[in-house]
Structures are given as C-alpha cells and as structure tokens.
Amino acid sequence: MNLNRDDTKENPFPMKKEIEKKSSGNRREFMIQLGTTVLGTGFLWSLPKMGLAFPKRKELTVKEAIDIIIKDIPGAPFERTVDQLRSGSMDQKVTGIVCTMFPTLTVIEQAKKIGANMIVAHETLYYNHQDETDWLEGDEVFQYKRKLLEEHQIAIWRFHDHWHRRKPDGIAEGNLKKLGWYPYYNASNPRLLTLPEAQSLKSIMDHIKVHFDIPKLRLVGDLDQPCQSIYLAFGAIDSRMIIAATQELEPDLILCGETREWETVERVRDGRLMGKNTALAILGHELSEAPGMEFAAEWIQEKIPDIPVNYIASGDPFLFY
C-alpha cells in the first residue's frame, strides 16, 4: 500500500457521521465500510476472508523478515554489503514494514504513526554510504535522529546492494513499470533501453515528469532532438562507467539521478559541441529511484503477507526557486 502524506495527518475519522449511519446494519459490512472509507481499499488486506474472528498474525523477527526478503536474490546473503541493520534489534518482533528511499525524520514519525516498527530504506541513514557514525558523535541532528529511533523502537535495515543485484534490478524494474517501459527491458543489456520508435527529447521529458512526479529536472541537450536509445543510470552511477558506456553505445539520452557536474556533464557537453547527439537528463537521486522502492513494498508484501507493508515517499528535498 502506498501511503501519501495526507494519510498520516490528524483527524482520522473525517466521515464519522456517514459511518455511524451504516453502523446499525451487519457488523461485518460496517467494518468493511469503516476500513474502505477511512483507510482506503488497502485496509481490506487485513480483514479476514470469512467471519469476524481475526486470525492471529504470524510473528516474525527483523532477522526472519530480512532472510525472507533476500532469500531468492542471487548470491545472497552478501559477505560485504552496506545492507546492514542500522537501528533496532534483529530479535525484535515486526509489527509493520515501511519501504522508503531515505529514512528521514518525517518517514520515521509516519512509520510510528501507522504502527510499523521496521523501515526498509534504500539509502543511508546517517549521511554517508557506509553509515559510519564516529565523525557524527558531536552532531545534534545525528543525536536527535538516533534518540528518536530508540524512543520509537524502530529497526532500520538498508536494502541497497541486494535490491540492485536482484534479477532484474529491483529499482530498474519498478522505474520502468512506472514509466510503462518495462516491455522494452533487455535482460542481455539491462542499462540500455530502446523505445519502439524515436520521440522528441521534450516528449520523453514530459512523460518522465508526469509519471515520476518531478516538477523540474536538469537537461543537457536539444528538446527537439529525436531519442530512441536511453542509457539508464538511476541513482548515482560512477561517471567513468557512464562515460565508458557513452563511448561504446552512443545512446541518444543518458537518464541519471545525480552526477558530479565536472565529469559526465562536461563530457556530454563537449561531445555535443563536437556534433555528437547524446543528451543528458538529471532527475535527482531520490526521485530517480523512488518508484523502485514503491515497487519494493509490493514485492515484499507478496513475500510477507502476514505483516502490513507500506511505501512512504521521503520526497524531493529541493525547493526550485
């Protein structure tokens, strides 16, 4: 289930009068009406198929949940990985799972509000890839965040390396499904997407902005140029890797989350000044991978049906002025 910001605001019973009118009828009908009116149709996932006796939900520890999630990923569990438990205990019982891109303070509070005590986050908790904290001990923001997690007893497990190593890459599959481009995915060359026919760069950008809910993006290129081959570099991909792929594949467009401006950006600019056709679109790290974590929530829910799994967007941190 996808929880947007409005789902976690106060006043959880905005249609109280309407529900009260229906409460005099069949008890089960009333419960279904309550669930669909207040929480949306996703609430029905937690209702029993027959009768009123709610079956006892199967209990899982954090470790058991993690083991289920990574079970079918090739090579898992990895010996060296950033996918570690960064908060909480492996032994604590899971009451609910939230998937997100960045485990921000807002996401933590929203998870607590819906009764979830495990956050599966794609990116780092403490502002560096390895989540090293020695250098942050004197930082008041770090201290506040750590204390908040302790108070709420929330476990945070990072789901980065394993999700990318899934076949297909979990982020890529979620992104391409969101764009309606998954039928064009090529397993033999997963980073190169070829559309059925060329489209203008403008039409592709408009399509991405709508489906990824991106208000603004940065672009090196000509909006009128035709594009058919797209190199996928969601998130943050090493510039040398992108430049090497550009040399070999000569894609019409590089679609990336973020990149150092003096590297890939300048290589694309100089290439265009020479007469090359490759354009570059920079979506932002969070927004370029968020649909992949929304997909992760659906994927994990199928594997762990007894525990509610929700997606909460961490959101774009930038204000465009």
Residue ranges of predicted features:
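Hydrophobic structural segments
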Residues: 3, 11-321
